[in-house]
């Protein structure tokens, strides 16, 4: 069989059971009052190691790179230190066992990729400020909401209003509640009942683009820019400051919101309603645009590099893939012809595209948007300008190690390969449909590195760590429920894993029992 030939998938083969590793028992790790002997302790750790190793080899359903072996070999020595990047990353602080110098190198790397300009200088409003997150992008999104809430709030003025699409990560709904940020749904329902400019009731989130059905369940997962512009216009006209979140690699469909296209629609709205100061200087804007790039902010810059110079990188993303514009370099001319930068903040997860063994991430904004840190700097010896107090000092080391191992050319190759594998999986699922006579509903948003399809048996979902989502093909009708799963083509996924998954699907009892 040649390297490019897919294995033959059996047609309507008798259903075969799938071996599933049972999760470890809690009793295996119970800690008695007297502790454990070395033998007992090591046996327990060996059991966990074996379980995680097996699961790592089959993980394809989540945005989590498992390509981590190199860092483990070189960085184990740092486990001897209690490393804590306490406080602001641009000041060493009183706790000296820290890796802030490495953290700043990582921030500088992403500042270059995201066109954020110069390293932090409090006297330079156009310099960037940021830090490495101890959580994933959820923390970065919360920090953006917190910063934006305080930046946009004016005494005696209408309260800021947040907008995010129905494909936004579920943590956003939690974050607005925790931080007391009002959504357009909440304000519209309470203050402007019956006035939704889209007609009908105020939607809970900004609608996403519809698909062939006319509904969003089979759409690409990107925000409906027309609907967003209409909603923002309504609240801007009422004097409300505006917070907008865009997604770059949405949670289930991997979609990229059209940040540039949306900004082209929103900038005139901001100007019409006085949310963009005419004079410049220190006067605050009345809007904040944030990009949740948990996944996509890690690879989108390399798509653009390849698109801009295909000869240098030996590849260019096709028109369907595109090269999203989403970062601090996105500028548009205002009504007087002056360029206006639109993006105020970006969040990215480090454990997703790059690959770190635990949740972490990067938050970045500009010095001109910062507000004073609220707590006592004298205790920690540095401004407490970050969301967390103690911050993981190992994450900068691991992310730095990854970035130092991979050139820009290497990073372009990683995203090229993921795009290629996404196309391969989508094609093979269509072929499997034809071979089995079963509708698998394979779908891929253009440019996404995820493919979604019919939910198989619970055993297969567990074996391959598949993430699931239920949709109603007719909104409000529970009889039209469909169950989907998806596969993310992360750098640790290869064709052999996909072929093994396809083989399992061809023998799965739930799939085979589906009427043809």
Which stretches of residues belong to each language-model region?
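Amphipathic, well-packed alpha-helical segments that form the structural scaffold of globular domains
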Residues: 107-115, 146-149, 177, 400
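N-terminal entrance/gating region of PLP-dependent enzymes' catalytic architecture
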Residues: 1-128, 482-488, 492, 505
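Conserved PLP-enzyme active-site core in the AAT-like
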Residues: 126-128, 132, 136-368, 372
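Glycine- and acidic
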Residues: 86-95, 120-133, 156-160, 201-214, ...
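Secondary-structure capping and boundary motifs in well-ordered enzyme cores
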Residues: 98, 102, 133-140, 164, ...
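Conserved active-site and cofactor/substrate-binding residues in soluble primary-metabolism enzymes
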Residues: 97, 101, 139, 223, ...
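Surface-exposed helix-capping loop/turn segments at secondary-structure junctions
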Residues: 53, 112-124, 153-156, 429-442
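Conserved C-terminal alpha-helix-loop-beta "cap" of PLP-dependent enzymes
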Residues: 43-44, 49-50, 158, 173, ...
């Amino acid at each position: 069989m040649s390297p490019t030939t897919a294995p033959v998938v059996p047609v309507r083969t008798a259903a075969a059971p799938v071996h599933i590793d049972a999760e470890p028992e809690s009793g295996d790790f119970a800690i008695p009052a007297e502790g454990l002997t070395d033998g007992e302790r090591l046996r327990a750790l060996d059991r966990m190691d074996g379980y995680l190793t097996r699961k790592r080899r089959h993980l394809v359903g989540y945005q989590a790179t498992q390509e981590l072996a190199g860092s483990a070999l070189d960085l184990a020595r740092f486990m001897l230190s209690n490393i804590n990047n306490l406080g602001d990353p641009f000041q060493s602080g009183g706790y000296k066992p820290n890796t802030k110098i490495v953290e700043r190198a990582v921030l500088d790397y992403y500042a270059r990729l995201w066109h954020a300009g110069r390293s932090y200088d409090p006297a330079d409003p156009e310099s960037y400020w940021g830090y490495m997150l101890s959580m994933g992008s959820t923390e970065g999104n919360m920090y953006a909401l917190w910063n934006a809430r305080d930046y946009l709030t004016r005494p005696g003025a209408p309260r800021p209003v947040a907008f995010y699409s129905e494909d936004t990560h579920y943590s956003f709904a939690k974050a607005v509640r925790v931080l007391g940020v009002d959504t357009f749904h909440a304000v519209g329902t309470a203050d402007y009942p019956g006035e939704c400019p889209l007609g009908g009731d105020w939607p809970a989130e900004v609608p996403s683009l519809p698909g062939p059905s006319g509904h969003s369940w089979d759409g690409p997962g990107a925000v409906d820019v027309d609907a967003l512009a209409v909603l923002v216009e309504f609240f801007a006209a009422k004097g409300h400051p505006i917070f907008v979140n865009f997604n770059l690699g949405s949670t289930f469909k991997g979609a990229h919101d059209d940040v540039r296209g949306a900004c082209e629609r929103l900038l005139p709205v901001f100007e019409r309603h006085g949310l963009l100061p005419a004079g410049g200087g220190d006067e605050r804007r009345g809007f904040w645009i944030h990009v949740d790039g948990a996944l996509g902010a890690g690879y989108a810059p390399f798509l653009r590099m390849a698109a801009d110079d295909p000869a240098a990188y030996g590849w260019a993303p096709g028109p369907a893939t595109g090269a999203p514009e989403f970062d601090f370099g996105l500028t548009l001319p205002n009504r007087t012809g002056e360029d206006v930068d639109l993006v105020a903040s970006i969040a990215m997860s480090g454990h997703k595209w790059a690959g770190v063994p635990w949740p972490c991430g990067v938050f970045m904004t500009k010095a001109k948007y910062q507000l004073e840190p609220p707590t006592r700097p004298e205790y920690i010896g540095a401004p407490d300008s970050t969301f967390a107090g103690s911050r993981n000092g190992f994450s900068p080391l691991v992310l730095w190690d990854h970035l130092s191992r991979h050139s820009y050319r290497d990073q372009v190759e990683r995203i090229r390969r993921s795009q290629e594998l996404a196309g391969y999986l989508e094609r093979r699922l269509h072929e499997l449909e034809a071979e089995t006579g079963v509708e698998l509903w394979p779908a891929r948003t253009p440019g996404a590195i995820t493919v979604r399809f019919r939910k198989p048996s619970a055993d297969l979902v567990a074996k391959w760590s598949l993430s699931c989502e239920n949709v109603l093909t007719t909104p409000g009708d529970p009889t039209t429920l469909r169950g989907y799963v998806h596969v993310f083509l992360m750098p640790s996924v290869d064709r052999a894993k996909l072929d093994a998954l396809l083989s399992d699907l061809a023998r799965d009892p739930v799939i085979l029992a589906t009427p043809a």
